[in-house]
Amino acid sequence: SMGGVSIKLPAPAGFCDLSPGHPADNRALTEFGAASEKEAARLFGMSAACQQLADWRAGKRPLPDDRVHFQTSIANMTEVVASPKAFIHTMCALLRAKGNEFGSAAVPDVKSKIEGAVANVKVNSQEFVGVMAEDDTACYAARIMKMRTPTDGDKTHLHLTSITVLKNKGIYVFRYAPYTSADATLDVLGKLKDTIAALHAANK
């Protein structure tokens, strides 16, 4: 519950919820939960691609790459959002201003923004792509992260952020995926939009 309001967080299609009752899941939930608290945020749940989650639990792979995290800022937990539309547009404007800071706003089309961020990102850092889409139910932004791993070498990851309002509470839905191409990124964005639609349907 968020500030006394009960909110349902259904896992996206093909994803399964991490459970505190499973040791591997509990470790991840605890670690990501602690990282969120350091950013003055609260993690409410995580889900991952079902097959990746099963393999991870069996010790056959590292943490699933395809994940969804549901969280909010601690300030948002008690705040009642009177106008969801205004809240979303304000948050999107803040993200657009951040894009201006990094120069990504000067690039007109989304695919070029993504490819530019991938070209510029350094190892063990991240590059802000900018706002990817906005409508009355959510604002969507992206960043590209490149990490060096001991076993798999350099891995480039996509991190999509969506900001929405459920039952007058501001919620962040993060979608993590391996980066493969700009077109594949737009597919992941489409799936995240489906996740947001399902969240709204579950919390009418």
Where are these regions (language model features)?
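Short N-terminal segments immediately surrounding and downstream of signal-peptide cleavage
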Residues: 1-14
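Second-shell loop/turn segments in exported
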Residues: 5, 73-82, 177-186
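Stable alpha-helical elements in mature extracytoplasmic
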Residues: 11, 83-87, 91, 188-195
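Primarily extracytoplasmic ectodomains and periplasmic/lumenal surface modules that are beta-strand-rich
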Residues: 13-27
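Solvent-exposed loop/turn segments at secondary-structure junctions
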Residues: 16, 146-152, 178-181
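Conserved polar/disulfide-associated segments of primarily extracytoplasmic proteins
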Residues: 30-150
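Short, surface-exposed beta-strand/loop micro-motifs that present aromatic residues
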Residues: 155-166
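Surface-exposed amphipathic alpha-helical segments
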Residues: 168-204
